[in-house]
Amino acid sequence: MSRIGKAEIKLPDKVEVKQENANIKVKGPLGELFTPIFEGISVKTENGIVKLERSNEDQKVVALHGLTRALLMNCVKGVSQGWEKNLEITGVGYRAQKRGEDLVMSLGFSHEVVYKAPKGIKIDVQEQLKIKVSGIDKQLVGQVAADIRSKRPPEPYKGKGIKYAEEFIKKKAGKTGKK
C-alpha cells in the first residue's frame, strides 16, 4: 500500500472537502480549489478527517493513490495557510518595483521587463531586491516564481540575476591570464 496515499488528512477549522463529479472541491478561509479524482480512487470524509481508498491494486491506481493524496493535501494547506515563494535579485542596477498589479524589473537589458501576475497570485516587492510570490495554488505559485526567475537566471561567474531565496549558486572560476 502507498505510504503517502494511506496517510489521513486532518482538516483544519473552516476547511470543507466535497466531491463533485470527477473533482474534489476544497473550500477554506482563503478561497477554494479543485483537484481531480482519478479513476479507481475514492474519497471518504468523517469527523474532519479525509481518507483516500483505492478500488484495486493495479499499478496505475497504486501510483495515482499517493499523487491524489498529495494534491489534496496541497489544496487543504493552500486554502487554510496559503503558499509563498521568495526571490532575490543580485546585480548592480538590477531592481524590481510594482506598477499597479504589474511587476516591473530592470535587469540589465535596454528595456524594462514587465510581468503581469495571473489571477489568484499576489506579488510583493520589498527593498527593490526581494520579490515575494504568494497564493493558494501551490503549482501556480511555483510556476509564477519560475517564470520571474527565467527573465534573468543567475549566471555562474558573479551570481548576477534572479534566484530563489534558499537557492545556492555554485560559482565558476574566471579565466586565468596568460603568463
From Swiss-Prot:
Q: Which PANTHER family does this one have?
A: 60S/50S RIBOSOMAL PROTEIN L6/L9, LARGE RIBOSOMAL SUBUNIT PROTEIN UL6M
User: What HAMAP family does the entry give?
Assistant: Ribosomal_uL6_B (MF_01365_B)
Q: Which domain of life is it from?
A: Bacteria
The UniProt entry's sequence similarity note says: Belongs to the universal ribosomal protein uL6 family.
Q: Which gene encodes it?
A: rplF
One GO biological process term: cytoplasmic translation
MF terms from GO for this chain are: rRNA binding; structural constituent of ribosome
Q: How does it assemble?
A: Part of the 50S ribosomal subunit.
Q: What is this protein called?
A: Large ribosomal subunit protein uL6
- What role does this protein play? This protein binds to the 23S rRNA, and is important in its secondary structure. It is located near the subunit interface in the base of the L7/L12 stalk, and near the tRNA binding site of the peptidyltransferase center.
Spell out the SUPFAM superfamilies in the cross-references: Ribosomal protein L6
- Keywords, comma-separated and alphabetical: Ribonucleoprotein, Ribosomal protein, RNA-binding, rRNA-binding
Q: What NCBIfam families does the annotation carry?
A: L6_bact (TIGR03654)
Report the PROSITE patterns cross-referenced here.
RIBOSOMAL_L6_1
Pfam families membership: Ribosomal_L6 (PF00347)
The record's Gene Ontology cellular component field reads: cytosolic large ribosomal subunit
Q: Which Gene3D superfamilies match?
A: Ribosomal protein L6, alpha-beta domain
